[in-house]
């Protein structure tokens, strides 16, 4: 389902742990990593879609997480034409997303990447809060930075993106 501008309604999930690290999933049979995300079905609320995607992609139930916040508005990214299915070219531009910030209140062992017959991820790890901005595929970077920046206000002890960049560039120079 596309909106009139050619964007597919979607939810993005930033799952955090008690150390303010974020869940980072490795796509099945690929070398790319990303946050869990997925489409919103007709008649489904963004929150309901988030819980469905969380179960499908990460194997977590609502009792395993606490919602800390969500983005106020849709965040959009365009998908390069060579990434778009041939039958969608001309009508599909990209994704528009509502992002949710969650805290894992369960255990790491509650994560189950094989909760469905069609897993999205075949590996996962915890990452520094800002690390995904530089690690995700280029066309998603702006949305990742905007989502993490907007939702950082719900986190205690998370440094600014600028401070993170300064710290990590200093560490890499040593």
From Swiss-Prot:
The keyword Hydrolase applies. InterPro entries: Nudix_hydrolase, NUDIX_hydrolase-like_dom_sf, NUDIX_hydrolase_CS, NUDIX_hydrolase_dom, RppH. A motif (Nudix box) lies at residues 38-59. Its EC number is 3.6.1.-. It holds the Pfam family NUDIX. One of its GO terms (molecular function) is pyrophosphatase activity. Gene3D superfamilies: Nucleoside Triphosphate Pyrophosphohydrolase (3.90.79.10). Residues 6-149 form the Nudix hydrolase domain. NCBIfam families: PRK00714.1-2 (NF001935), PRK00714.1-4 (NF001937), PRK00714.1-5 (NF001938). HAMAP family: Nudix_RppH. Accelerates the degradation of transcripts by removing pyrophosphate from the 5'-end of triphosphorylated RNA, leading to a more labile monophosphorylated state that can stimulate subsequent ribonuclease cleavage. Belongs to the Nudix hydrolase family. RppH subfamily. This is RNA pyrophosphohydrolase. The gene is rppH.
């Amino acid at each position: 389902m596309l909106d009139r501008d050619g964007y597919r309604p979607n939810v993005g999930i930033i799952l955090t742990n008690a150390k303010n690290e974020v869940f980072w999933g490795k796509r099945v049979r690929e070398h790319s990593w990303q946050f869990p995300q997925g489409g919103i079905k007709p008649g489904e609320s963004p929150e309901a879609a988030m819980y469905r995607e969380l179960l499908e992609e990460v194997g977590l139930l609502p009792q395993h997480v606490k919602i800390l916040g969500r983005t106020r508005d849709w965040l959009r990214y365009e998908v390069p034409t060579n990434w778009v299915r041939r039958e969608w070219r001309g009508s599909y531009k990209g994704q528009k997303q509502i992002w949710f910030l969650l805290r894992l209140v369960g255990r790491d062992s509650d994560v189950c990447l094989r909760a469905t017959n069609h897993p999205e991820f075949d590996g996962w790890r915890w990452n520094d809060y800002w690390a995904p901005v530089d690690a995700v595929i280029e066309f998603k970077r702006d949305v990742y930075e905007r989502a993490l920046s907007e939702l950082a206000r719900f986190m205690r002890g998370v440094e600014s993106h600028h401070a993170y960049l300064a710290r990590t560039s200093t560490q890499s120079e040593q």
